[in-house]
Amino acid sequence: MDKSKINLAVIVPLFFIMLYLLPLGLRDLWSPDELRYAEIAREMVDSGNWIVPTFNDIRYFEKPVMGHWMNAISQVLFGENNFSVRAASAFSTLGAAFCLFLLVGRFANRKQAWVTVSVFLSLFLVSNLGTYSVLDGMLNLWLTAAFTAFFYAADSPTTSQRCRFYGLAGLFCACALLTKGFLALALPVIVVVPFMIWQRQLVDILRWGWWVMLVALIVTLPWALAIHAAEPDYWHYFFWVEHIQRFAAEDAQHTSPAWYYLPYLLLGTLPWLFLAPSAIKHLKGHWQSPLLRYALLWALIPFIFFSAAKGKLVTYILPCMAPLAIILAQGIISAFENRAKGLKIGSVINCAFFSLISVAVIVLFYMGRLPLEAEEFYRPWLLVVVCGSWAVLAYISIKAKSLEGKIASYMLMPLSLFLLAWAIIPNISIDSKMPGRFLEQVSPLVSDDAILIADYPSTMSAFNWYFKRRDVYLTGNTGEVSYGIGYDDAKHKYVAPSLLGEFIRKQSVPVVILFREMDVPQSLPEPDKRIERGKFTLVYYDRVKR
């Protein structure tokens, strides 16, 4: 690739459209996350209640409201479909990339800004969560904006500029808090304070800290008071259960060892992982840059913080990716300017690795070792196309003479995977985590007056979303709606497994039960129909036979 033919200012927007927007509607929604957030937003729009989040008309206090607002607005704009469910995550990622462009473009240069954005948008963890409906992408937008505003404020020479940028930082911290809670306030504090100490500007943050907190309070207070008036115990549950127990208590959710994030960090930095050793090596001499120091603390301290917490999920380290992109971009530029052999070596390893994966997929396919059905014969070949195109781009990057050529080659490597993912996902995954196809198959059995029963909130959300119902009964484990279903006006939605047979016999309308997490109880009456597909089992009772 020749420098005269490569313009990242053109390629990056096209890349965003092709990877982040075009495939959004192609894949069915994943359970439980995407169906849960799709349904909460749908109920918000349908009910007109934008204060109290509900899930199957059950109070849902696990998260604040900003992420649900963003998802709901997306459904208002684009309708109730797969694209709208994921659109807020995609545009949040674009917003975070724009913040990085402003930050690096202002305190480094325009070329480095485009390289940083190229790295960020193509990081495997970023692109995965940017095309998947979870709240972490939206949280990352507000945190990236807050960290950008803090750095602008620290560098501002006048009082009016500092007032403006510290105020913006408070605004973005409030939006982050309204998206995922008090964690949004902790991360800026544990990063910005050490940075200001390093820069010998601690007095500055002490002088302006009150202003940041005041703005955050002003922005947060209207909804905080509204939710307290509507549901007085919201803040008690949200603070103690969702924060203290999730992250620190002995019975914290998702407990994992301290090293849990390390392999995911390596995977999440693909395809740039192959250039990372050379990039890090050539950062020597650049650490006097305040921006690079800031990025180091921004990446390292939250990573240590999340690693030390008892509760862990891969999505938690997403806020570390933006500063990592700043560091990698600076290192790659420096390595290229010094004609480092490490860049070529990394690309050779990259090319060889994905070439070997292509061969391995073909061999495993012909040996019958892939978990595929006969009708899925084409899926391995699509995966070979993905790995082959990745290897070809790695080879092109070796031959590229310009920095822009190398960057564009690496940025485009994940593109074919995301464009073809909808066709590569095997039936074994579809029939376990994507219930849309199964429910479409059984939809003729689900009349408007049928009683729907699910064995877990994940199957409940599938009934909710695909049949536009908010009156689904639960049996078995209540999971994440355990607290909400304990309210007097929601208790009737739970039927204990031991009482399920009696409940069915009392009905005068069809009963449809979806099982995934539990076996069908032997005590149930003989169903009129029983349909199984993968991990999903549906039992149907017609009103005629009682």
UniProtKB/Swiss-Prot annotation:
One of its GO terms (biological process) is lipopolysaccharide biosynthetic process. The chain crosses the membrane at residues 6-26, 87-107, 113-133, 177-197, 208-228, 260-280, 289-309, 313-333, 345-365, 380-400, 410-430, 450-467. Pathway: Lipopolysaccharide metabolism; 4-amino-4-deoxy-beta-L-arabinose-lipid A biosynthesis. Keywords: Cell inner membrane, Cell membrane, Glycosyltransferase, Lipid A biosynthesis, Lipid biosynthesis, Lipid metabolism, Lipopolysaccharide biosynthesis, Membrane, Transferase, Transmembrane, Transmembrane helix. GO terms for cellular component: plasma membrane. It is a multi-pass membrane protein. It is an enzyme of class 2 (transferase). The keyword DNA damage does not apply. One of its GO terms (molecular function) is mannosyltransferase activity. It comes from the Bacteria. Its EC number is 2.4.2.43. It catalyses: 4-amino-4-deoxy-alpha-L-arabinopyranosyl di-trans,octa-cis-undecaprenyl phosphate + lipid IVA = lipid IIA + di-trans,octa-cis-undecaprenyl phosphate. It is found in: Cell inner membrane. It holds the Pfam family PMT. Belongs to the glycosyltransferase 83 family. Catalyzes the transfer of the L-Ara4N moiety of the glycolipid undecaprenyl phosphate-alpha-L-Ara4N to lipid A. The modified arabinose is attached to lipid A and is required for resistance to polymyxin and cationic antimicrobial peptides. This is Undecaprenyl phosphate-alpha-4-amino-4-deoxy-L-arabinose arabinosyl transferase. It comes from Shewanella sediminis (strain HAW-EB3).
